[in-house]
Amino acid sequence: MKTRAVILAGGEGSRLVVLTAKRAKPAVPFAGKYRIIDFTLSNCVNSGIFDVMILTQYRPHSLNSHIGAGRPWDLDRGFTGGVRLYQPYKGRADTDWYVGTADAIQQNFSFLKDTNPELVLILAGDHIYEMDYDAMLSFHTDHQSDLTIATIRVAREEATRMGILATDDNYRVTQFMEKPKEPPDTLASMGIYVFSLPVLDKVLSEDAKRKDSHHDFGKDIIPHMVKTGMRVFAFPFGGYWVDVGTIDSYWRAHMDLLKHPPELDLNDRTWIIHTRSEERPPALIQPGAVARDCLISDGVIIAPGAVVERSVLSPGVYVGPQAVVRESIILTDASIEAGACVERAIIDKDVTVGHNASVGRIVPDAPDLGIATVGKSAQIPGGVVVGRGATIGLNVGPDHFSRAGVRDGTTLEREPFRAGM
């Protein structure tokens, strides 16, 4: 059946703090060479879906630049589909920014129906997973479903921040709870939905008229459909899936890539993750350098005597002589100078960690203070110590640091960033 995918890519992702201060969550780099949205886009084309809408909102500039006309994903098409990006606009009868996920679709429904799809596949642009959507579309048709929700089993401690479902023996959803304080089950919504176009039109139109609605799929649309007896089914997914919505989950997802075997195999040639790549020379690991259990991107230089272990290095990263990088994520064109030590940290683009400086630390059997993070273009002067779980904001320069450094779990910032959503 003719299917159109709609990717919701407007999320602020404020729990990623400095990583999303200047970019949308789907545009955050992942696994060295990719952006988070690459996984959803690649799932679409690998599933034979070449008609894709992307709804953006928060700081869309880097995302728009990355996707462009869609060529890396074979989505630079005209009359046969392709990718189109839509941002909030102000019309006579329209609001400004989207107030919820359902509102985002509703405001763009006139564009959505332009290509006359029979089915609409609604996706999140900020999850890491590989999935053949064709199996879910067939499940939807076979069950004559009004709505099909992709589901996965999660740990009970994660269930409180997700939509949780109960089903009967035929996968029909009998109950749906958005972020319950005491989840009765661990079957969670993945934020992936299949509707027929007429059903989607009906439920969105009805929801738009409800003054007490948040205009959100998880909070309003799905519970109402279940309550009123519509045919809502759960499609079980058994693969790897993670919402990298926090610093900890983002870091852990990278560590998952370094396991033997990895929980998500980026080398699977039957399911290629496509991306827009810069032209960079091959990585250079100089004599005397050590690199173990790492993902190393093009343009990386690891100098003599440096040690890099269980880490992910993005394009253009420099690791100087005698420097140490362990269990860390280093983003594009960051420089770890001679003798510096970076452990359990995330270093954003264009950061310099000065000679003999230290960011984060691995302390066996000590309380977990989280992952140290350093925002884009920050400059950490030589010899300064940035503690475990500390946060350095964007563009923080050498003059902002004291000799005492930055204590464990504290924040040093130049430009305030919003957090807490």
Which ranges hold each PLM region?
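Left-handed beta-helix
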Residues: 1-4, 198, 206-421
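Unchanged
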Residues: 1-258, 368-370, 376-377, 407-421
